[in-house]
């Protein structure tokens, strides 16, 4: 069996005392990592689905790297809308190939499964885009490897959540990936970040899920931006034979209460 740990939306600042709408994201990430260590979880792979930083500074990426040191030998990453591709690549040059602002993707295999990371980042934008090249890359990789099953990772979820303000900043070409999910039954799971809460949706034979942030939590019920005092968390994915099982783990309690966003957010 292969165990994958997914972390998302870390939103660290270079200033260790900085808060994101009242949430000390460096402290909450440390709490999440301590919870993982105390649980005895030994993941074979660790995936970060974007928003490593909030300020996109080189020194912040260095801090993220230091905090993730126990997982560096098995770390896979894609950028979010609060990432700078070149700086993320520079901070993790031993893990991320390519140069400059090129797309950041990944591919690895585990127990006959193919795991692919897609880059939905649009520089300067909050929403995301997959693009036809990445759709064809997925199709090509699946055809080449003939895996038992496929797991996709990306920052922006390729579905409408039914939460108006989050759907406005989702993937603009989500229909293209949904078509692929409908035609390729081996794609069993699409695991995403961006929306700072857990959710589950079905597209074709695939389950499309989102994961809580390691810091600030969004309300899944409000049609406009609202933050909630919920514990941070992470996702565990287990691959065994033809089975793909996934669950969210949250810390026991929320230690901080967020400040609500401005109405124009």
Show the residue positions of the predicted features:
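N-terminal active-site segment of His-dependent metallophosphoesterases
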Residues: 1-63
């Amino acid at each position: 069996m292969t165990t994958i740990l997914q972390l998302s939306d870390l939103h660290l600042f270079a200033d260790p005392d900085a808060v994101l709408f009242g949430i000390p994201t460096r402290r909450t990430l440390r709490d999440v990592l301590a919870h993982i260590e105390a649980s005895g979880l030994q993941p074979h792979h660790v995936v970060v689905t974007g928003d490593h930083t909030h300020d996109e500074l080189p020194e912040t990426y260095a801090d993220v790297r230091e905090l993730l040191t126990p997982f560096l030998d098995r770390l896979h990453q894609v950028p979010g809308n609060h990432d700078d591709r070149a700086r993320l690549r520079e901070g993790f040059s031993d893990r991320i190939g390519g140069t400059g602002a090129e797309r950041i993707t990944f591919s690895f295999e585990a127990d006959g499964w193919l795991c692919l990371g897609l880059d939905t980042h649009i520089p300067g934008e909050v929403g995301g885009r997959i693009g036809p090249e990445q759709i064809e890359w997925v199709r090509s990789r699946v055809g080449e490897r003939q895996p038992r099953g496929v797991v996709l990772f990306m920052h922006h979820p390729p579905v409408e959540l039914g939460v108006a303000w989050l759907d406005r900043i989702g993937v603009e070409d989500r229909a293209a990936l949904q078509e692929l999910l409908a035609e390729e039954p081996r794609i069993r799971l699409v695991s995403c970040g961006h929306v700072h809460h857990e959710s589950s949706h079905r597209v074709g034979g695939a389950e499309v899920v989102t994961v809580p942030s390691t810091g600030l939590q969004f309300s899944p019920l409000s049609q406009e931006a609202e933050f909630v005092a919920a514990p941070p968390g992470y996702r565990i994915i287990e691959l065994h034979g033809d089975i793909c099982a996934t669950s969210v783990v949250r810390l026991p309690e929320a230690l901080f209460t967020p400040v609500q966003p401005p109405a124009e957010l």
